[in-house]
Amino acid sequence: MKNKIFHTQDLCLRTNLRCAKNSARMEIIMSEKVSIGILAVQGAFAEHQAMLDGLGADTFLIRQKKDLEEAVQNGRLQGIVLPGGESTVQGKLLRDLGMSDQLKELIEAGTPVLATCAGLILLVERVSNDDRAYLKTLPVSVKRNAYGRQLGSFVTDAEITHVGTYRMNFIRAPYIDEILDLQVETLAIVDGNTVAVRYKNQLALSFHPEVSEDARVHAYFLNEIVQGV
């Protein structure tokens, strides 16, 4: 099957997604339609789904254990999104719904994952200001609500390695306060704090790219992590 190549500018026109004027050139290279499961127990899953659908991915929602199991059995799970929201609620629901162990196993086995804000907290090995930890697949430590609660939310422009200058939306956001493995790649720093990292198959962000009109973070996830382009 011939690869489909879309320039970011074309994608913006086709999906009403905005490209920053100073953005690095990026392409979506789809050798086939990739299938991405989006955790949908709580949080901003619909926004992630709209962004990925606009980039040509085949998305589905993971609301309960059987959704995850069926996707694995059918070979339909090529990537996972853990959205922003409330990490304590999401973590409790994952345990109550019996999905924690399987998600952890899938991620540790190499299934690509994009985690934003609360999703980042679900992944990390340690939360420096909270005793609770969840999947523990990402060797970093984070500080929850590091910028304060709702009144501490803000928007800023900063550089993301491999992506370019990007407008970041921080909403009751954590930041990464310690890297625990030399293989963790820091992708973005804001005011001296690490806010985006990659570790093998895991892309984790403090901010919310799904509420942006800029699709480049999701494009990077599809290109470089899901498809390994």
Regions flagged by a language model, labelled:
Residues 45, 68, 122, 129, ...:
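Flexible, glycine-rich phosphate/dinucleotide-binding loops
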Residues 41, 116-118, 138, 172, ...:
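A secondary-structure boundary/capping signal
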Residues 59-60, 113, 202:
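Hydrophobic anchor at the start of a short beta-strand
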Residues 1-12, 17-96, 102-106, 215-219, ...:
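N-terminal beta1-alpha1 cap of cysteine-dependent amidohydrolase-like domains
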Residues 30-32, 72-74, 105-106, 114, ...:
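Solvent-exposed alpha-helices and their adjacent loops that cap or buttress functional pockets
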Residues 144-229:
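Amide-donor transfer/coupling interface in amidating biosynthetic enzymes
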Residues 82, 115, 205:
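Redox-cofactor binding/interface segments in oxidoreductases and associated redox assembly factors
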Residues 86-158:
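Cysteine-nucleophile active-site neighborhood
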